[in-house]
Each structure stands twice: as structure tokens, then as C-alpha cells.
Swiss-Prot record:
Expressed by the skin glands. Pfam families: FSAP_sig_propep (PF03032). It is found in: Secreted. The modification Leucine amide is found at L65. Its main location: secreted. Belongs to the frog skin active peptide (FSAP) family. Phylloseptin subfamily. GO terms for cellular component: extracellular region. This is Phylloseptin-H9. It comes from Pithecopus hypochondrialis.
Length: 66
């Protein structure tokens, strides 16, 4: 009977460790996805911030040529 208890505790412990590792990997993956989304948003903001100066430069170039 003691052998069965030890085996059961060992199985439960290993299952708990495995579950903990899976949860940690899942959390890391979610953090990486969030970081990627934030990077994409900041790049979009930078591009949109430059857009007015690009447009005004193009307009002034067209005025000089036309």
C-alpha cells in the first residue's frame, strides 16, 4: 500500500511540474505576442507621424515643377 501511495504522489508531482512548465511557456508566448503588437503599433505611429511631412514635401516639389 505504501508503494502505491509513493507512486501516486510521484505521478501527481510530475504532472504538477509538467503543468507548471506548460503554463510558463504559454505566458512567455503571450508576452512575446503582446510585445510584437506594441512594436507594430509604435512603427505605425512613427510612419503616420512622418506622413504629413512627406506629403508637404511632395506638394512643394510639385509646385516647383508645375
Amino acid at each position: 500500500m505504501a508503494f502505491l501511495k509513493k507512486s501516486l504522489f510521484l505521478v501527481l508531482f510530475l504532472g504538477l511540474v509538467s503543468l507548471s512548465i506548460c503554463e510558463e511557456e504559454k505566458r512567455e508566448t503571450e508576452e512575446e505576442e503582446n510585445d510584437q503588437e506594441e512594436d507594430d503599433k509604435s512603427e505605425e505611429k512613427r510612419f503616420l507621424g512622418l506622413l504629413p511631412s512627406i506629403v508637404s514635401g511632395a506638394v512643394s516639389l510639385v509646385k516647383k515643377l508645375g
